[in-house]
Curated annotation (Swiss-Prot):
It comes from Canis lupus familiaris (Dog). This is Nuclear transition protein 2. Residues 1-21 have a biased composition (Polar residues). Residues 22-67 have a biased composition (Low complexity). Plays a key role in the replacement of histones to protamine in the elongating spermatids of mammals. In condensing spermatids, loaded onto the nucleosomes, where it promotes the recruitment and processing of protamines, which are responsible for histone eviction. Residues 1-129 are annotated as: Disordered. One of its GO terms (molecular function) is zinc ion binding. Its main location: nucleus. One of its GO terms (cellular component) is nucleosome. Zn(2+) binds at H12, H16, H24, C29, C31, C35, C38. Testis. PROSITE patterns: TP2_1, TP2_2.
Amino acid sequence: MDTKTQSLPITHTQPHSNSRPQGHTCSQCTCSSHCQTCSQSCSQSRSSSQSPTGHHSSSGHQSQSPHPTLPPRHQKHTRHSHHCPPRPTTHSCSYPKNRKNFEGKVNKRKVVKRSQQVYKTKRRNSGRK
């Protein structure tokens, strides 16, 4: 039992010291690769927009292959921007709902008054009998 507890911290310290530098290099690698991919896609979109200047429609169609990579990215952005509008839409939705509820309440009150009147007349009729 004692040897196990002693060996555990030792094995724990080793991966920790190993994972720390690895994690740093990993994060740096991902960052640089991400930046490279970003810059590459940016340069590609720039070059593609420059090369098909409307002179060759056929080459424009071919150069559209890098373009489809851009629209999905735009779609993601659009989705994010779409996520924001629904909130105001819900507000505008709740506004008419409140209106309807208000009208409904007024109508219900009228209906209740009518039913009460009918109830009174019925009572009177039953009282007459």
